[in-house]
């Protein structure tokens, strides 16, 4: 019996925050602030059996893009993203795999992108609170900012999520990114193509980070098994 495919959806979103709403630190974007803008982003639905390796050459060709400048309104952009994710959830159900839900994967998504999407779906009337609860439970999330904690020597006893560039400096050292705040200026200057290219590269790096972390986990588990076998061999 063949194993049903499970989608791992790598994604990255961008926002615009007007000057009067900008904070020095933290997430300045608020999905309920009518002056803020949800710019959209890209999603890459990867097959668990075929795409979770480091041999992908054309990342952009595997991505689905949703950008504000390609839609008449923010509401229609949000609606398009909602139906895209709903379709992925339905595909999982049709595959008959009830134990493994579609996995949403990114860096820092549990405190930013995922809550933002749910609130945008509520704001534009696509979900009420009970339906939002059901919707989010059709998915599972994997935040590399948390998963990567074990891949670093922590200087104290506080296990704290790692920043995007901290993770990328280990797994894609040739590619680092400016703060997401740089996108605000790009949007004001209408440099939309640069924003699009940035997001494609961010998702590519997230995918490479996923593969790199998986390889590290397997390596460490291999060392653990070797140590166990050595202890058993020389146990008196």
Question: Which residues does each predicted region cover?
Answer:
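Short C-terminal domain-edge/linker segments immediately following a structured domain
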Residues: 39-47, 135-139, 228-230
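C-terminal accessory extensions appended to soluble enzyme cores
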Residues: 211, 215-236
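Short, low-complexity, polar/charged sequence segments that are solvent-exposed and flexible
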Residues: 27-33, 123-126, 161, 227-228
């Amino acid at each position: 019996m063949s194993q049903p495919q499970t989608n791992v959806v790598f994604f990255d979103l961008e926002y615009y925050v007007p000057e009067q709403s900008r904070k020095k630190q933290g997430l300045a974007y608020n999905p309920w602030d009518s002056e803020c803008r949800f710019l959209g982003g890209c999603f890459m639905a990867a097959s668990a059996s075929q795409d979770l390796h480091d041999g992908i050459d054309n990342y952009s060709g595997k991505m689905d893009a949703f950008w504000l400048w390609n839609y008449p309104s923010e509401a229609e952009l949000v609606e398009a993203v909602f139906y895209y994710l709903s379709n992925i959830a339905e595909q999982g159900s049709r595959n008959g795999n009830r134990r493994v839900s579609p996995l949403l994967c990114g860096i820092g998504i549990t405190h930013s992108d995922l809550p933002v999407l749910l609130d945008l779906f509520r704001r534009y009337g696509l979900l009420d609170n009970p339906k939002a609860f059901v919707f989010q439970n059709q998915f599972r999330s994997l935040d590399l900012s948390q998963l990567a904690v074990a891949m670093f020597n922590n200087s104290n006893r506080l296990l704290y999520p790692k920043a995007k560039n901290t993770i990328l400096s280990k797994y894609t050292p040739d590619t680092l990114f400016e703060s997401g705040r740089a996108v605000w200026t790009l949007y004001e200057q209408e440099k939309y193509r640069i924003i699009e290219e940035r997001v494609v590269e961010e998702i590519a790096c997230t995918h490479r980070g996923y593969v790199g972390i998986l390889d590290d986990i397997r390596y460490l588990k291999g060392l653990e098994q070797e140590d166990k076998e050595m202890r058993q061999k020389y146990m008196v």
